[in-house]
Amino acid sequence: MLRLVSDENFNGDIVRGLILRRPGLDLIRLQDIGLEGLDDPAVLAWAAANDRILLTHDRATMPDFAYSRVTAGQSMPGVFVVNDRIPVRQAIDVLLLLDICSEQAEWAGLVLYLPL
């Protein structure tokens, strides 16, 4: 099972759908733990400190900050960049498939753009 965190701009319908379809999913929303307003490097640092793969729609800046952590030798558990133009159901299906078929450690240091 993957340990996930969604950034504050991640589609709430996707988050709700994930939780409805898999109630035991280990998913935290940053805004639910009082961490809204953090910049990208701080979000990635929190995700790394808590060993959580980041869910984001931010393909403009988040991947660059993620790879900067990797090249600096810092921990980066992974980032899933979900295209915000795909149907909500497709995003949910893809994320649940990754949760079922992969392990947390497989995504360390990687940025995955979804859908594939």
What does each model-identified segment do?
Residues I28-L30, L55-T56:
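Short, conserved beta-strand edge motifs with alternating hydrophobic and charged residues
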Residues L2-L25, Q31-L35, P41-L44, A66-L116:
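Acidic, PIN/NYN-like endoribonuclease modules and their adjacent C-terminal/linker elements
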